[in-house]
Amino acid sequence: MNIMRTAMLLAFMTALFMGVGYLVGGSNGMVIALLMAGGLNFFSYWNSDKIVLRMYGAREVDQHSSPVYYKIVSDLARRASLPQPKVYIIDNAQPNAFATGRNPQNAAVAASTGLLNQLSAEEVAGVMAHELAHIEHRDTLTMTLTATIAGAISMLGNFAFFMGGQRHSSENSHSTGAIGGLLALFVAPFAAMLVQMAISRTREYAADRRGAEICGNPLWLASALSKIAGGGHTVYNEEAEHNPATAHMFIINPLRGEGADSLFSTHPATANRIAALRRQAEEMKGARVENMGWNEKIGLHKKSSDFRDLNSGAQTSVFNEESTVQRIKKRPSWLRYGDSKRPRS
């Protein structure tokens, strides 16, 4: 269902792009627009990950420089049968994370220092599982293509408007051409923006569900989303504000003013996502114990003692709701860090 909807929305964006090209230069303009889209997408396919990581000043880490964070990602990737992605840290106080890369073999995940400092190991695992789900679903490529096409539509729309519909004026239909230019300038970019946001919202729900399956506990991600949403919008993310086209990449919209689950939001409402994850937790009861190999009686409300290795030593507990905690009493065997060493300074 989600794949079909995404394919239909992408097809609509491509048709919209070609339509704007037709307004600019007739049938020739439509062909040129299609070729232009292909060129832009080819460039984005090979370079988008490098561009966005450089844009946010991300630095790569490994098992020596950030052992716990790296181990979480490695263990989750292995559980999802994915290649080991590159692991990055962004020096930003806003708790957030994203994934990028053209395919699972060339993927990367990035988490902010704010996220690593404020979340427990279990919550970080939930977030990273969500990002790995995006990689598994190839959402990173899908969103790159939609962002590229949306930007190209906006560019062509401006060009069509300033052309003033010249191809129609010679036939005494200047007004029709002007109307076409206005449509290209305002309606087409607006429609492309709505489609891009719709694709983003669709994929977030799918990544939440698959991420919960990867880590084995939907409540870890639900708790992480609650904390990120609670503190994220109080911290100004300068890079994201200057590059709003990348907002859809993050697990929570990094821009100020993100509100309800509407046509104009890049992400579903956090409350709706948490509710869906809680329902999934109920569905997974029993299956978690049978399939995940739980063997430690450590409640999720306890702090992850070795998670202070990540950065500053800040630690937080997970959900405080006793009814939620009591339903999930154990931590899976793969999430143990008793032998992790502190990162080298």
Curated annotation (Swiss-Prot):
It is a multi-pass membrane protein. Binds 1 zinc ion per subunit. The chain crosses the membrane at residues 6-26, 27-47, 145-165, 179-199. It is found in: Cell inner membrane. InterPro entries: HtpX_protease, Pept_M48_protease_HtpX, Peptidase_M48. GO terms for biological process: proteolysis. This is Protease HtpX homolog. It comes from Bartonella henselae (strain ATCC 49882 / DSM 28221 / CCUG 30454 / Houston 1) (Rochalimaea henselae).
